[in-house]
């Protein structure tokens, strides 16, 4: 019996994720207030921050707090949005930006405590979008393209349409139930959504970045699927390459 309990405990720890800090209940992680931008790169990230309408599954939650403690996520059991309809402490969206092939890429990512329920359950899920603009230092910067990067190296490339922008020219995304695979996906929508407090990768305290970088967000019951934080150093540029929506380096 003791060995059975130890094995179950070890398996649970593997699924929940490991890091050098502390794992916390998903609804107790304290989000960061959105900092006041101090440069044009941060201003652009705030300017283009999308709205998110959730029609399926979990709402976004903070993944890490200031001391580096990270969300333990949720088991993929019960209703698809069970215990994850929004944190009373507030939500969060994360971003990281850089030049890529002569265009400025702003990657936004939302953390969901679970991705899907049932036999193929996912604990931890990241939904990611990349917005491409011409130059963040320009007051009249132009939106050039959008990629909905689904975390498993698949990319959706859809032309930007007016109905997918709000009155302030902010993009509107929907987190919906994907066909053939009951898990959250991002798509463009005409529905009004909500925005979350944004914090960029560079604005995060060092302990928080370390927590997100070292935690292994294992999602499957046997720890075989790892949901990596898309903004961390060894993943970010690979994701930009996956998300590149233009036919060559100089397409506008």
Swiss-Prot record:
Record localization: Secreted
Primary subcellular site in the record, as a coarse category: secreted
Keyword terms, alphabetized: Glycoprotein, Secreted, Signal, Virulence
One CC-aspect GO term: extracellular region
Pfam entry (one): NPP1
Residue span of motif Hepta-peptide GHRHDWE motif: 121-127
Record's signal peptide: 1-17
Entry keyword 4Fe-4S: no
Keyword Glycoprotein carried by entry: yes
Domain notes: Key residues/motif important for the effector activities are degenerated in most NLPs, including the nlp24 peptide consisting of the conserved region I (11-aa immunogenic part) and conserved region II (the heptapeptide GHRHDWE motif) that is important for phytotoxic activity.
Family: Belongs to the Necrosis inducing protein (NPP1) family.
Function: Secreted effector that contributes strongly to virulence during infection by P.capsici.
UniProt cross-references to PANTHER family, sorted A to Z: DOMAIN PROTEIN, PUTATIVE (AFU_ORTHOLOGUE AFUA_5G00600)-RELATED (PTHR33657:SF8)
Protein name: NLP effector protein Pc118356
